[in-house]
Regions:
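ABC ATPase NBD coupling module
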Residues: 12, 66-82, 111, 185
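Helix-to-loop junction immediately C-terminal to a conserved catalytic motif
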Residues: 49
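Conserved ABC transporter NBD signature motif
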Residues: 57-65
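Conserved ABC ATPase signature
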Residues: 134-138, 142-144
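A short, proline-enriched helix->beta-strand linker immediately N-terminal to the Walker B motif
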Residues: 153-157
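Catalytic Walker B motif of ABC-type/P-loop ATPase nucleotide-binding domains
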Residues: 159-162
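Helix N-cap at the start of a conserved alpha-helix in ABC-type nucleotide-binding domains
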Residues: 170-172
Length: 220
């Protein structure tokens, strides 16, 4: 489902975000992407979402070569992706329900269908009772769970969660991770990046480690 073949990302003559990375992530797999800040985790995630293109090598997602995909094809690729970032980027002038409905509305879904699916997504993360609340009325952990609901409302094949538990207390972090693991259990491919050792210590899935843009331990 996700394949990197000798992928490098070079920003200047001697500045590499990724260097000769090769890995495979199978359909339905849960993978933790570990490493300190600046290790290249976010760059790897951005390549899967076609936000970044490789300087060399090949990135393939669902059979599509990210380096060759045309700009017009990127929205179609992303319809199969659920993207979750450390900073939720919720719209403060919309309710929680409105935020979760938005990905469906922008693709032309009828409002009634979008609302029904958004309510179902909020129910899955335990926030249906806060549907009418505004983002600033929620805690950081609750806002991150809204971001999870928004990411899964379009029923993606792949969830990319970039540091989803950063700056959360342990209880809030655990609830976010529990939600992501539940989606994985339902068959969704999940890639979760983190530098939190507590998250990794409790991980029962494969861990891919990056340091200075390179895989630790070789190809995976």
């Amino acid at each position: 489902m996700i394949e990197f073949q000798s992928v490098s990302k070079q920003y200047s003559h001697d500045a590499y975000a990724l260097r000769e990375v090769s890995l495979n992530i199978a359909k339905g797999e849960l993978v933790y992407l570990a490493g300190p800040s600046g290790a290249g985790k976010s760059t790897l995630m951005k390549m899967v979402a076609a936000v970044e293109r490789p300087s060399s090598g090949v990135v393939t997602v669902n059979g599509q070569d990210i380096g060759r995909i045309k700009k017009a094809g990127i929205p179609f690729l992303r319809r199969n992706l659920g993207l979750i970032f450390q900073h939720q980027r919720l719209l403060n002038d919309r309710s929680i329900l409105g935020n979760v409905m938005l990905p469906l509305l922008v693709t032309g879904a009828p409002k009634t269908q979008a609302e029904g699916r958004a309510r179902a997504a909020l129910d899955k993360v335990g926030l249906l009772d806060r549907a009418k609340a505004m983002p600033l009325e929620l805690s950081g952990g609750e806002q991150q769970r809204v971001a999870v609901a928004r990411a899964i409302v379009n029923r993606p094949q792949i969830i990319l969660a970039d540091e989803p538990t950063a700056n959360l207390d342990r209880a809030a972090a655990d609830r976010v991770l529990d939600a992501l693991r539940a989606f994985h259990a339902a068959g969704v491919t999940c890639v979760i990046s983190t530098h939190d050792d507590q998250v990794l210590d409790s991980a029962s899935a494969r861990v891919i480690r990056l340091e200075h843009g390179q895989l630790v331990g070789g190809a995976v």
